[in-house]
Amino acid sequence: MARPNEADRGTDRALADLERRINSVYSQAAKELQEEIDAFFKHFADQDKKMQDLIGQKRNGKEWTEKDYQQWRLNQMGRGARLEALRDKLAERATEAKEVALAYVNDATPEIYSLNRNYTAYTIESVHPSADFTLFDEQTVKRLIVEQPDVMPYYPERLALKRGIDLAFGKQQITASVTGSILQGRSIKQISDDLQSRIVTMSRVSAIRAARTAVTAAQNAGRMDSYAAADEMWGIKSKKKWVATKDLRTRHDHGMADNQIVDYDQPFDVGGYKMMFPGDGSLGAPGHELYNCRCTVVNATDDDLEAERHMMRVKNPETGEYELVKKKSYKEWYDEKKAQY
């Protein structure tokens, strides 16, 4: 089994930081939303208690029943201008939180991409001394996205908020939450708690899922683009291997693809769908094969490349001759590369 390397560990740290930032955004949103929800239901609290206490009593010559009380609640809390105003405000705030979260994701992916592209370049140079990659950094990636996107053919698209769809879905969920809670006879506190949980948790889970999916795509795209560059510039043909996370959360199709090896420019067969790498939807793989994926693609010989201190051939910058030396660590290789600029 491929062991986690420095690129894997760096990617995991970046994802953990990203999730912390997203959770912080939603914690603040939850606090603000709770204030709006509390204000809305406080308006009804006293009257709601009075109407509930009337059950079994005569009102306007007719016995006031549980059904009458439920209908009153629907008319007062489940419909009308007040609910619409609350619905619109909550949906807008949740959408704003998701917009910030996606901006965080888009800001993080260049660093994740460059880390994995550079690390893969290091593994290739370790066994192919003729290769001489140029280092990528976050700013280089951001510039190339605009100026030379063809240099990074596998770089994932930016995540974009579908504002209209998100708003409409949020409003629908809010209305359904209030109406459903009333029909189930929940107390005002229970209605309030369910509404807060549904709107915030639903949006936060969606944002975290988008972050994990985007990080996986950027991680593996960086590796793929190094394979492609090695072939284009030095004729080095790499084979790639699908590596699935070994636990019970891994979906069946991805577990079955584990250790599948193909040429770097050929797709994997994952559950009958073609994918160039984990997180790749360019060949038509559906969302259920992409979302929350934790798989990675590695060079098919990465198990050998990652072993401690193999010998490697490098060019002596003073003599121009190739020499056999102990394999450099990634940090040593990176520092030497950086010193060349």
Describe each PLM feature range.
Residues 194-198, 202-210:
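Charged, compositionally biased non-catalytic regions
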